[in-house]
Every structure is written in structure tokens, then in C-alpha cells.
Amino acid sequence: MKLFFTKEQEWLDRWDAFLLTENHGSHLIYSDWLKSYESYGFDFEVLIVLKKDKVIGGFGAIIAKKLFFKFYIIPHGPVVTSGYERQISSLVAQIKIRAKKYNCCYAQFSLPISQEKIVEKQVYNHSMITSDFPEVFSGKKFKYIYCSYGINWVSFYDSLSPHDFIEKMSVQVRRNIKLAYKNSPEITFAKSDDECEKAYKLIEENAKNGNYSVRSYSDFKKTFLSLLNTDKCYFIVAKINGEIKGVGFFVKCGNYITYISGGTSKEKPDLKLGYLIHWEAIKISMRLGYVGYNISMGGSPGVIAFKSKFNTKTIYFEEPHHFMILNPFVFNLYKLLNIVVAKNKSYFNKLGSTIKIKK
């Protein structure tokens, strides 16, 4: 076997192709997703493991930088093809070696471990991980990069068609899906920059009205378009009388589709387009031959309750996050500064505003 680190596009393309059809894969380590952190001044790289010129594993790492502090973060993984789980320990050793090379004070990785049969192909179980990781602790001390911690699974069971599957949904869900289609929505897929920007405005508006944050379109645009152009995602748009009333952004990876974000126009009566958007994603998933759909973790209490209506099985990975402190002095200094800033947040915000005005 051969392993090497790379940022060359040819190898990044091969890495992405591997993740797309690898059950343990995640969109969080697609090269385009890793590149999106460059807008924050972060760097990235990919470790690839080859056997007879075939990619069988690796990991995607983000090198996060804050002042003079550096952190080496793997949002999901290491990832290996089934049958090569014994290589995980050696890949974890590579995380430490590589992080030290970059003078990082801290390294972190997140493994999808679960005993749930319903997602057994998408996860590792403890019997696959043959040894403990030396000098590695359970937990997550760096919280500025989203890392996988579970999967919110909509299983298609033995359904042979969307019609079979919808019959297993509750009466309420079936009714609301039918109500959404009664408004004769036009279902399209945003493809161009202009189409995506217009559709994404609804996501930004929902975030503003709901008092939560999403990345701006300008910040995420490059990632969006690259994923679309390489057929790794879907941006579903529902229009009524030519106006955008509902949107949903979904990424294809690991032999399933994951819901990333979406938005609907608030109308009276409710157009029920949230149900329609997810139903369209489920139909695409079934058409691709997938066995389930990841409606995604998290959200407000209302969003979580809405997702649960699709007969979800919310699976939290078992102690997913692991970390290594590589330079205790520097890392403790970082923690201290974080505490100081958190306790004096209003002061630092005012200071930042003053500096901007003076400029």
C-alpha cells in the first residue's frame, strides 16, 4: 500500500470519486467542501491510501489558523473501504505526524461509530477498530468547524417505489405532500450562478427571520457551483406562478443524499413546500438505488419535530470526536484567550467597531 498527501486536482478528483460511492464517505471531506474554508484563511490537504492504484482510504484535513494558533481538523474519518478497518490506527498516527509538521497545537478527528443495524454499512463498529489510539482523548475542544456526530436516517426499508414508501408515512405527511402539489408548483433544479444566487436568497431570508446564521452565498458560491458542475449535489427549487417559494440544497456522497439547508416562503395558508422539497429528495434517492436518505442532524425544536415526521431514526455516533494536544503550552494559551474574549465579548465588539471607524 502507498499513502501520500496531496492538493493536486487530479488526485482530489479521484478522492471525490472514491467518497461518492464509498459507504463510509461524507461530503464534509469532499475537496470542494474543504476548499470552502479557504475563505476564512484556512488551508487543507488530503491523505490518500492506494492499493494497486485504487483508492481504498484516507482523510481530508483542514488546517485552521487563528492568530498564531494552528489546528489540524478532520471533520469525518479517517475513511477506509470495508475490509481495511485495521488501517485506521495507522492513519490516526499520520494525523499526529502531519499536524506536528505544520506546528499545530491540536489535532482532532471524528469517527462514525455505531451499533445500529439500520446504518451498518455507513458506520464502523467497535470490533472493526482493533486498538486504542495512544495519546488520544475522547471529546472536542475546537468547535469552529462542523464535524460529523450522527446521521438522521430515513430508511426506505423494502419499498420498491416512492408509492410503496409513501404508504408507510403517517396520514399527516401524506396529506401535506398532496396539499403541496395541489398548488401546481414548478419543480426545477438551479444550475447557473444566477439561478443559485436567487434561490439561496430564500435560505438567507429564513435564517435572518429565524435568528440563526448561514454562510453567505458569496462565501459559499465557489463550492456550490463546483459541486453542481460535477453532479455531486442538487439545488431543488419550487416555484408558484413564477416566484420562488421553496428551495432545498442536498449533497450526494457515501451512497446516500444528505440535506444541507433549505427555506420556504411563509404564506397563509401554509403551502407545505417543506414536505414537497424533502419528498423530491427522497424520490431522487430511490431513483438512484439508495437504501435511505439523511435528512440531517440538528435544527431548532420545530425543525427537529418536522424532520421526525418522515419516520426518521436519529442516530448519534458513539463518542465520535477524538483529540490530541500536541503543544500543551500553546493550546492552554489559546483556551485562556478564548475565555477572556468570551467574558468581554461586548468590549471587543466595540473595540472592533472603533478600529473600523478610525480606518
Residue ranges and their predicted role:
Residues 77-83:
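The substrate-binding groove and active-site-proximal loops of carbohydrate-active enzymes
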Residues 82, 89-98, 221-332:
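Aromatic (often tryptophan-rich) hydrophobic motifs at membrane interfaces
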Residues 100-113, 118, 285-296:
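Conserved GNAT acetyl-CoA-binding A-motif
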Residues 35-36, 63-65, 114, 121-162, ...:
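Active-site/acyl-donor-binding loops of N-acyltransferases
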Residues 2-68, 113-120, 124, 136-269:
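A conserved beta-strand-loop-helix scaffold within acyl/acetyltransferase catalytic domains
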Residues 78, 92-103, 111-113, 156-157:
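Generic hydrophobic/packing signal
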Residues 74:
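Flexible glycine-rich active-site/ligand-binding loops centered on an Asp-His dyad
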